[in-house]
Amino acid sequence: MSDIPGDLKFLKSHEWVRIEDNNRAIVGVSDHAQNLLGDLVYVELPNIGDHLDAGATAAVIESVKAASDIYSPVTGKVIEVNTTLSDKPETINEDPYGEGWIMVIEMQAPEEISNLLSPDDYTEVLESDEH
């Protein structure tokens, strides 16, 4: 199992979020998710300015195996997207918790963070999926 950074929160659907000061939330997909999908070939990013509700579809990633919706872990406005992924979707495969981030959301309801999984809770989800 891959190392899971301790400063992240997760959804059961394998999205991660890193909370920064000033209510900014950086969002990506977990190493587990990119491993399951295999080599990514396309990323459909949200538009800057899009309003997203927590749990709503925010982006789509496609691999040689399948397409997968990416869900927003928090409610807010998209203020930045990782345009590198348009030309190099494999960046998610290479560095899912770093350069492979997907978007930055300005959170409207920071208290939603308490609904997300801690790294330990996410590890338990992965372990229960394997059995």
From Swiss-Prot:
Keywords: Lipoyl. Binds 1 lipoyl cofactor covalently. The keyword Cytoplasm does not apply. Its cofactor is (R)-lipoate. GO terms for biological process: glycine decarboxylation via glycine cleavage system. The modification N6-lipoyllysine is found at K65. GO terms for cellular component: cytosol; glycine cleavage complex. InterPro entries: 2-oxoA_DH_lipoyl-BS (IPR003016), Biotin_lipoyl (IPR000089), GCV_H (IPR002930), GCV_H/Fam206 (IPR033753), GCV_H_sub (IPR017453), Single_hybrid_motif (IPR011053). It holds the Pfam family GCV_H. Residues 24-106 form the Lipoyl-binding domain. Belongs to the GcvH family. The glycine cleavage system catalyzes the degradation of glycine. The H protein shuttles the methylamine group of glycine from the P protein to the T protein. The glycine cleavage system is composed of four proteins: P, T, L and H. HAMAP family: GcvH (MF_00272). This is Glycine cleavage system H protein. It comes from Xylella fastidiosa (strain Temecula1 / ATCC 700964).
